[in-house]
Amino acid sequence: MREKYLDVLKKHNIKYFYHFTSINNLDSILENGICNRLYMDKTGIKYNYTDKNRFDNQMGCISFSLDYANKSMLLYKQKRSSNDWVIIQLDAEKILTNFYDKIYYCKYNASSPTVIKILNNNKNYLKTIQAFNNMFDESGKLNFQAEMMLEGNVSCEYVQKIYVDSLQTKFIVQQLIEDNNYKNIEVIIKKEMF
């Protein structure tokens, strides 16, 4: 079954998943991985909300964008916060290889009325290969709000790069990476992603 999910990645040439967060959460992420809110609350991990309301009500999940970061959602979050933000790039193939059956594949933003209705009435459908295929339209394009929600947590072994929007933020992130003994995570200034 796993191979079918990996085939969808290959068919659409998806190599990366993206997760954006406040830079204030990065030290915790480098120490604990990208963790869901339920786990962080239970274990006492400190974090800054990136989605205080969480209208999809999936507290046990973490969210990823496919192929590119959800720029409109990031801009929305940036306007409501004075924090600097980072975009974490993860290896899509490795994530799907290990978590394909723990992911909800949402054609639209998970807090949209369409997805919330499915989450309330037929949640398991969103874990199917059909739901993953349905994220793409007939021409192979994703809705700009499409997202995946992974039940559980993801360690930093899947992190490849961290994108920032300034040299100052790059220095801060590089220091955090060094403090947490990671040598294989690259930090890149890429303003157009923000």
Q: Where would I find each of the regions flagged by the language model?
A:
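Active-site-proximal loop/hinge segments that shape catalytic or ion-binding/gating pockets
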Residues: 1-63, 70-194
